[in-house]
């Protein structure tokens, strides 16, 4: 029975692909292979690597490849950088466990790193996208960099990458289930009700049946945690946007006041009403003559 490590919030992706058989099926689908020797797959996930409180990565050694699979609900161009750091730690552990000498005159042979990002966010993305560490380098793009890390991002939202889904039933079921939850939320159901209904529907349709029968409560807890994390990040972004908008308006009002303009004149210049500007205007006037931005901001937050 799949159990969730209580030291972190696991992701549904990790629960679905927790077993070696399921992980090998995903590997075969991604690589177009047909391996059946799941016991040869060695999982070596770094258990202390947690992103935003959520554990959403799986790494494993198989067929001379060092694989890093990560599920993402946001489009993140910094995945290659994270992959570089992750692979460095994995290779360090691999070298130590195999007692290899990096100072030897002999060439040390290493497993080939492969980084796959499984994307199921709401932002529109292509079915397949290549992300490179070198895209972040500030130097000339034609200059030869000493380091590179490439991540292949696959869009696994329901309806995308159909051929890949046909090759891996568990990936199809994962995508179908996530879509079922989202449909429930879009229909106006509470998140908890949407998850419950998606689970009931999945059991009826035979989607993720074994996992849901054995771990219904665990799956529900994990999905609620994931969606709450998404909502938190969305709220943080929205709050940041709103703060930036207000600070920009404060700066404009300060400039107008220094030019001797009244509240009415400023409102006319900004094409708004005095009522909409009054609170900020009064906070700015209170901070005269220094007009300290942070003091003005704190004054507005108190109000």
Show where each model-derived region lies:
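Elongated, amphipathic alpha-helical interaction scaffolds
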Residues: 1-303
